[in-house]
Design a protein with these regions (language model features):
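Contiguous mid-protein beta-loop-alpha structural module that forms a pocket-lining wall or clamp
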Residues: 343, 358-360
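Conserved, mostly hydrophobic/aromatic
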Residues: 193, 213, 230, 266, ...
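Short, acidic/polar
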Residues: 347-353
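Proteins enriched for Cys/Gly/acidic motifs involved in redox and nucleic-acid/cofactor modification
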Residues: 1-238, 277, 292, 314-325, ...
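Short flexible coil/turn linkers enriched for glycine and charged/polar residues
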Residues: 176-179, 189-191, 288, 298, ...
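Conserved SAM/AdoMet-binding glycine-rich loop
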Residues: 105-110, 118-119, 222-345
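Terminal RNA-binding accessory module
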Residues: 1, 6, 378-467
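Short glycine-enriched, charge-decorated loop/helix-capping segments at active-site entrances
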Residues: 80-81, 202-203, 242-245, 305-311, ...
Length: 467
């Protein structure tokens, strides 16, 4: 039986909004405008969370700045998916002790997935005394009252509720782009892959109600947003906890029929919950980009079982082949882990052969990183680091060759793009499949859809000319 999502009551959110007003009044009484810096690590969900943090800070009277130097409030939104990300966070948080020494009144907060791990919170308490506050993803909506408490008392605060999570609607947002927007449709994950810390720190799956999502998307379209991405740890599970008979494909179809000129994307998916219905929906509606990020992680059944992925190589390939059969221009991307505990050379070769079979447009490749508290962290791992690095390099070489071959096939073709900025002397744009295109043009094209003819390519990007 699916759990019903816990929705934060409107009166509680109104209380937080009132606190924002009180903080704003406090700074007005001091005769100056405070500044805040938000630093984000990790995935797109963290980016979306940081936009809400910036929204609450702006509602509290803060000017959002792009450096920690001289900021009155610093918020670091952390990532726990790999050891490298955590190491960077610890290093940067440690360096802030010098920044705070120059600005003693500065308030420093840590949030995000690392703060969902008790051992991390204890380390922050004991070894990073210059940090004023900590809150985990479930407590994000309470940030105004946490900030107010620290401002009033100068006492450290740790809000690390261990609940299964919640949903808070109507939190103010300061988006990082006026062209592209993230829309969280659900939070948490129920899958418990053996290597992944996310379900432990993000909680169980909770879906937003479809009418709330539609209202947000309508507002974005009205504001001129052209590229909208629906976010969730596993969007394919959307709606299962609501009991409304609305699944992810239904939600996508409803959004795709809204008036306006925009592209609709989504991430991330889990293959065990992907369906032909979803592929059919993508194929049916022009506004849904012909792009599917479908992480396979390994091409070997024994490794997939050890990862607790709940699908086989054959089941995955059937999905990928079906998508390409009904949409020959479908852009397929994926995640893959190299060096999972116990992976043999033959099992690694199964991963290589799957990549050759599917011919992904791009891969996000990682060497296995053990996460404390996950089953995989306790597995015997006899493969030397040097061997893992060799396999990683070989896999990247294979994928880079395939990516270049696919890009070479675009030369001479005309594609639709959305121009998103300038890089030195060239404009940059993205195809609906997310490919980077560089071309000469005027800045007036930024934010517009138009056609370009591809004249050249590299492994990672295309070069084009305006039609």
């Amino acid at each position: 039986m699916e759990r019903k999502p816990v929705v934060i009551p409107q009166e509680a959110l109104e209380k937080e909004a009132a606190v924002c007003g009180q903080i704003k009044a406090l700074w007005a009484s001091r005769g100056r405008t405070p500044r805040a810096f938000v630093d984000t690590y990790g995935c797109q969900q963290n980016e979306a969370d940081s936009e809400r943090i910036r929204g609450m800070l702006r509602a509290s009277g803060y000017e959002i700045v792009d450096t920690e130097e001289g900021a009155d409030c610093i918020v670091i939104n952390t990532c726990a998916i790999r050891e490298h990300a955590e190491t960077r966070v610890y290093g940067n948080v440690g360096a802030l002790v010098h920044t705070k020494a120059r600005h003693p009144e500065q308030k420093i907060f840590l949030c995000g997935c690392m703060m969902g791990q008790p051992q991390v919170v204890e380390r922050i308490k004991n070894s990073y005394r210059h940090v004023d506050g900590v809150f985990n993803p479930h407590e994000l909506w309470r940030f105004p009252e946490l900030l107010q408490s620290v401002l009033r008392t100068n006492k450290r605060i740790f809000a690390v509720d261990d609940s299964a999570g919640n949903i808070a609607e109507g939190i103010p947002v300061v988006r990082s782009s006026d062209l592209k927007a993230w829309v969280s449709i659900m939070y948490g994950c129920n899958n418990f892959c053996s290597y992944c810390i996310v379900p432990y720190v993000r909680g169980r799956e909770r879906s937003r109600r479809p009418e709330e999502i539609l209202e947000e998307v309508k507002g974005l379209i009205a504001a001129g947003y052209k590229d909208i991405t629906l976010l969730g740890q596993n969007v394919n599970s959307y709606g299962k906890d609501l009991g409304l008979g609305v699944d992810f494909a239904d939600l996508m179809a409803e959004i795709a029929q809204l008036p306006g000129e925009f592209w609709l994307r989504f991430m991330t998916s889990h293959p065990k919950d992907a369906s032909k219905k979803l592929f059919d929906t993508i194929a049916k509606y022009p506004k849904i980009t012909k792009q599917f990020h479908l992480p396979f992680q390994s091409g070997n059944d024994r490794v997939l079982k050890a990862m607790n992925r709940h699908y086989t190589r054959e089941e995955y390939l059937k999905l990928a082949h079906y998508g390409r059969a009904i949409m020959p221009d479908l852009v397929l991307t994926s995640d893959v882990i190299v060096g999972f505990p116990g992976e043999t050379e033959d099992e690694f070769e199964d991963t290589i052969s799957l990549i050759e079979d599917v011919r992904y447009d791009a891969l996000f490749t990682f060497i296995f990183s053990p996460r404390a508290g996950t089953p995989a962290a306790k597995m015997d791992d006899p493969t030397p680091k040097e061997e893992k690095n060799r396999r990683f390099d070989r896999l990247c070489d294979v994928q880079n060759r395939i990516s270049l071959e696919i890009h070479q096939g675009y030369v001479g073709k005309t594609v639709r793009v959305l121009c998103d900025g300038r890089d030195k002397d060239m404009l940059t744009a993205r195809t609906e499949g997310g490919r980077l295109v560089r071309f000469a043009g005027d800045d007036s094209l930024i934010g517009q859809f138009f056609d370009v003819t591809i004249t050249g390519c590299t492994t990672w990007s295309l070069v084009g000319e305006l039609r």
